[in-house]
């Protein structure tokens, strides 16, 4: 039915008869389901530290991932906002990807545990995440983070949030340089659907009905959906887009979010941004984050490229025994 590579096809066979998130009986059940799928033992080479950040929108739990061999050294920062439909996801369910990025970039991965639906809706998690970003930049020395160029990254709705972080950083004059934006299948429009929603309406791991449920839950006020923060594809100005840093967008070819990711990349390119659009053939949504998929050859290659793009903006560090 879907053109998936063997690893993705095998995983699809395992999950195809299971309920989708919107069919699980509630927000907590959907959250618990992803936590179960993503159970993971902490990597022995990665230091994981949690801190509490923020007053107006916090306190927010923030997890810092870094190599244990570099724990006493100041490192550059990758600020990562996670996917999960604004409903699911945590530092635990995304740990395997965060550990890998920390290992491959030799940076500190800053992971805000923003407040999810139903406890908060738009724009609270965006403001909350920006409060964390602003704090980490202004108090970098307290957390062994290099003051200088940083990177933003995120997947799915976390990619949507990373775009918002970039927009807010420009508008609010965040006192740092953002040198790279890395996005996996970002949500870029929330008030209408592009063609891939029809083509992949019943795609594995993310369906049209699930996305409808997520958007309606996060953005219950339909007027909010036609704003720059909610739908940057159509409502973010050319003037702001032209100020975006080099951006790489990784997309799955079997994903309802495919077309809006391509379209957002094209808008960046038309505004002179060094933007790359990479389609991963035979991959379903979240193929780099899902534990059962991320060891496939395409996922490994994408993570390698993402880490390379991140590392090239940071000061180079020679650490024997760890991959570049």
From Swiss-Prot:
EC number(s) on file: 3.1.1.-
Induction annotation: Expression is induced in response to 2-benzoxasolinone (BOA) exposure. Expression is also induced in response to 6-methoxy-2-benzoxazolinone (MBOA) and 2-aminophenol (2-AP) treatment.
The yes or no answer to whether the keyword Amino-acid biosynthesis is present is no
Any single GO molecular-function term of the entry would be: hydrolase activity
Which Pfam families would you find in this protein's record?
Abhydrolase_3
Give the phenotype of cells or organisms lacking this gene.
Answer: Does not affect tolerance to benzoxazolinone.
Record's keyword annotation contains Transferase: no
Q: Which UniProt keywords apply?
A: Hydrolase
Q: Show the active-site residues.
A: 156, 255, 285
Report the domain of life of the source organism: Eukaryota
UniProt record similarity statement: Belongs to the AB hydrolase 3 family.
Q: What does this protein do?
A: Esterase; part of the Fusarium detoxification of benzoxazolinone cluster involved in the degradation of benzoxazolinones produced by the host plant. Maize, wheat, and rye produce the 2 benzoxazinone phytoanticipins 2,4-dihy-droxy-7-methoxy-1,4-benzoxazin-3-one (DIMBOA) and 2,4-dihydroxy-1,4-benzoxazin-3-one (DIBOA) that, due to their inherent instability once released, spontaneously degrade to the more stable corresponding benzoxazolinones, 6-methoxy-2-benzoxazolinone (MBOA) and 2-benzoxazolinone (BOA), respectively.
Please state what the protein is called.
Answer: Esterase FPSE_08126
Classification lineage: Eukaryota, Fungi, Dikarya, Ascomycota, Pezizomycotina
């Amino acid at each position: 039915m879907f053109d998936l590579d063997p690893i993705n096809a095998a995983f699809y066979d395992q999950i195809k008869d299971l309920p989708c998130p919107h069919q699980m009986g509630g927000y907590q059940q959907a959250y618990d389901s992803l936590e179960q799928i993503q159970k993971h033992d902490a990597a022995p080479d990665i230091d994981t530290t949690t801190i509490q950040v923020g007053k107006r929108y916090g306190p927010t739990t923030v997890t810092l991932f870094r190599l244990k061999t570099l724990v006493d050294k100041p490192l550059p920062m990758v600020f990562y906002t996670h996917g999960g439909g604004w409903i699911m996801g945590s530092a635990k369910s995304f740990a395997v990807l965060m550990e890998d990025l920390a290992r491959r970039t030799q940076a500190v991965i800053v992971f805000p545990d923003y407040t999810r639906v139903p406890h908060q809706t738009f724009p609270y998690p965006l403001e909350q995440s920006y409060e964390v970003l602003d704090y980490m930049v202004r108090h970098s020395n307290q957390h062994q983070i290099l003051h200088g160029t940083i990177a933003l990254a995120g997947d799915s709705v976390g990619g949507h949030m990373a775009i918002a972080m970039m927009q807010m950083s420009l508008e609010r004059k965040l006192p740092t340089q953002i040198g790279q934006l890395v996005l996996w299948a970002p949500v870029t429009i929330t008030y209408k659907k592009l063609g891939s929603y029809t083509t992949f309406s019943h795609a594995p791991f993310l369906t049209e009905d699930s996305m409808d449920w997520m958007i309606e839950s996060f953005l219950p006020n339909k007027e909010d959906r036609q704003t720059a923060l909610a739908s940057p594809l159509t409502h973010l100005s050319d003037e702001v887009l032209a100020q975006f840093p080099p951006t790489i967008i990784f997309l799955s070819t079997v994903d309802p979010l495919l077309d809006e990711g391509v379209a957002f990349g094209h808008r960046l390119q038309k505004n002179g941004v060094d933007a790359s659009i990479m389609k991963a053939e035979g991959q379903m949504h979240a193929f780099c984050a899902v534990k059962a998929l991320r060891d496939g050859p395409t996922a490994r290659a994408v993570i390698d490229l993402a880490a390379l793009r991140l590392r090239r903006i940071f000061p180079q560090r020679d650490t024997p025994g760890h991959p570049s």
